[in-house]
Regions:
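Nucleotidyltransferase catalytic core that binds NTPs
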Residues: 1-185
């Protein structure tokens, strides 16, 4: 898998099907997006994520993430993606207009995008799926729900973890929650 930071990007020659998102925790909803990307055989398979997480950029240390960028890289590599694009989320990136963000996607040679129903982009989240549909084929899967009919989200997973309800967190993660770290003694 090629890992490419957008600020070091040159034009991609391969046509790609691209999932875009923060993918913090890579829960069942994220996994559905990734499966859809992998189902297309007419393109290379790619993911665009952000580092730091946009909420961490805006909120600072108040925003906690489930995955580090290293964890995401490892996961997408294990899933057999051809490309992982990383947008360094800083003041410049946050200021991109809708048209500037679309221009970045065109540099990636995107044939098809796979995004969640509530995907927003561009300065102050001014762009939406309709803006993307003007330029690309866009696939938007149905929102996945938990057994309790709650929308599966990283926020819900964090809530369950904070409550100590790891069993419920695991159900919507689709795997056992774990923490990576160094043990000192």
């Amino acid at each position: 898998m090629k890992v490419i930071y957008l600020d070091k990007l040159s034009k991609i020659e391969d046509e790609i099907t691209l999932a875009i998102g923060n993918f913090d925790g890579v829960h069942l909803g994220h996994q559905k997006l990734l499966e859809i990307v992998k189902s297309y055989q007419d393109t290379k398979h790619a993911v665009l994520t952000f580092d730091p997480h946009p909420r961490k950029f805006f909120l600072g240390d108040k925003h906690k993430t489930l995955f580090t960028i290293k964890g995401k890289i490892s996961l997408f590599e294990d899933k057999g993606f051809d490309y992982l694009f990383i947008g360094t989320f800083n003041k410049e990136f946050a200021s991109l207009s809708v048209d500037e963000f679309v221009a970045v996607l065109k540099q990636l040679n995107v044939k098809r995008l796979v995004v969640g129903k509530d995907f927003r982009f561009g300065f102050k989240a001014s762009g939406n799926i309709n803006d993307l549909m003007k330029h690309f084929e866009v696939v938007v899967p149905d929102t996945l729900k938990s057994k309790e009919a709650e929308r599966i989200s990283t926020t819900l997973i964090k809530k369950y973890i904070e409550e100590g309800n790891i069993k419920k967190a695991n159900e919507i993660l689709g795997y056992d929650y774990h923490v990576l770290g160094v043990v000192e003694h």
